[in-house]
C-alpha cells in the first residue's frame, strides 16, 4: 500500500464522517502546536509524518530526523495550520510517531545487546495486518535489517511445509527449476540432524529454530567444516539477555520477531502554543 493511501485510510478511520468539534467551532484560525517526547527513544516515522502534514496543508519545522535519539521534553516537531486541522490529525500523527519510534527504540536496544558488526539482526513477518511496510521501515530506523517482506521474496520451508516432503534433496532440485534464478531457499531446522540434512540437500540458508546456544555452535562448526557457503540464521525466543551469546555462536544472522510484536508506544504528546 502506498504511503498516501495508507495515511488516507488512517485519517478516515479516526475522522469517520467528520470531527464533531468542527461543528461547534465558531471560527477557524491559524494555530501552532508542538510534538514533544515524554520519554527517551529513537525517532522514527518521519516519512509518514511529513506526508501526512503535507496532505493536510500543515507547515512543519522538524527538529529531529529518523534514527536520531531524543530525550524527555525534547520538541520533535513544531507544526502550524488551521486549528481545526491540527486537532483532526493529532491522534493519527501521534499514533504513527509513537508506534514507529517504539519499534525503532526496541530494535536499537537489540542492536546494542547483539554487539557484533558481523552478525545481522533481522525482523520477521510477525507484523500487524496492513502495517508490514510501516513496521519494517521502523526496524530499519532502529539499525536492523529486514527479513522477507512477503512469501514472494524467497522460499522458506518450515515444519508445516516439510511435513509432506518425503525426499528433501529431490524437492529442492525441483524447486530450483521453478524458482527465479535469484531466489534463495531457506530451511527451518529444529535439530542438528535436520540442519545437516538441509545443508546436504542444497539449502542456501539454514535456520536454527528454538535451539540452544550450544546446539547452534555445533551446527556452525559443522557448517564451517563441510558447507562454508551455506548461511546460518538463529531464531526463536531470542531475548536481549541471550542475543549476544547467539551472536558468538557462529551464525550469520539472528531473526527476532519481538522487534515488532513486543515493541510498545513511545510516550509523546502534542500541545498547543
From Swiss-Prot:
Keywords: Glycosyltransferase, Pyridine nucleotide biosynthesis, Transferase. Pfam families: QRPTase_C, QRPTase_N. CDD domains: QPRTase (cd01572). The keyword NAD does not apply. SUPFAM superfamilies: Nicotinate/Quinolinate PRTase C-terminal domain-like (SSF51690), Nicotinate/Quinolinate PRTase N-terminal domain-like (SSF54675). Pathway: Cofactor biosynthesis; NAD(+) biosynthesis; nicotinate D-ribonucleotide from quinolinate: step 1/1. It comes from the Bacteria. Its EC number is 2.4.2.19. GO terms for cellular component: cytoplasm. Substrate binds at residues 91, 124-126, 148, 158, 188, 209, 235-237, 256-258. It catalyses: nicotinate beta-D-ribonucleotide + CO2 + diphosphate = quinolinate + 5-phospho-alpha-D-ribose 1-diphosphate + 2 H(+). GO terms for biological process: NAD biosynthetic process; quinolinate catabolic process. GO terms for molecular function: nicotinate-nucleotide diphosphorylase (carboxylating) activity. Involved in the catabolism of quinolinic acid (QA). Hexamer formed by 3 homodimers. Belongs to the NadC/ModD family. This is Probable nicotinate-nucleotide pyrophosphorylase [carboxylating].
Amino acid at each position: 500500500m502506498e504511503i498516501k493511501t495508507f495515511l488516507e485510510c488512517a485519517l478516515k478511520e479516526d475522522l469517520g464522517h467528520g470531527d464533531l468539534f468542527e461543528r461547534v467551532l465558531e471560527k477557524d484560525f491559524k494555530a501552532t502546536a508542538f510534538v514533544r517526547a515524554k520519554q527517551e527513544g529513537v525517532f522514527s516515522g518521519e516519512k509518514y509524518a511529513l506526508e501526512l502534514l503535507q496532505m493536510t496543508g500543515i507547515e512543519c519545522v522538524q527538529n529531529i530526523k529518523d534514527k536520531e535519539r531524543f530525550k524527555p521534553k525534547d520538541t520533535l516537531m513544531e507544526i502550524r495550520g488551521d486549528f481545526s486541522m491540527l486537532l483532526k490529525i493529532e491522534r493519527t500523527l501521534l499514533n504513527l510517531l509513537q508506534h514507529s519510534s517504539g519499534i525503532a527504540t526496541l530494535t536499537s536496544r537489540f542492536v546494542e545487546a547483539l554487539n557484533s558488526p558481523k552478525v545481522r539482526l533481522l525482523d520477521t513477518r510477525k507484523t500487524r495486518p496492513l502495517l508490514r511496510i510501516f513496521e519494517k521501515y521502523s526496524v530499519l530506523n532502529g539499525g536492523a535489517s529486514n527479513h522477507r517482506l512477503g512469501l514472494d521474496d524467497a522460499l522458506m520451508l518450515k515444519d508445516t511445509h516439510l511435513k509432506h516432503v518425503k525426499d528433501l534433496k529431490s524437492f529442492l532440485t525441483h524447486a530450483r527449476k521453478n524458482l527465479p534464478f535469484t531466489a534463495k531457499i531457506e530451511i527451518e531446522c529444529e535439530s542438528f540432524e535436520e540442519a545437516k540434512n538441509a545443508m546436504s540437500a542444497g539449502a542456501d540458508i539454514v535456520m536454527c529454530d528454538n535451539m540452544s546456544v550450544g546446539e547452534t555452535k555445533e551446527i556452525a562448526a559443522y557448517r564451517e567444516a563441510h558447507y562454508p557457503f551455506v548461511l546460518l540464521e538463529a531464531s526463536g525466543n531470542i531475548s536481549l539477555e541471550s542475543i549476544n551469546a547467539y551472536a558468538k555462536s557462529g551464525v550469520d544472522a539472528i531473526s527476532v520477531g519481538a522487534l515488532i510484536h513486543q515493541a510498545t508506544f513511545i510516550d509523546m504528546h502534542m500541545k498547543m502554543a
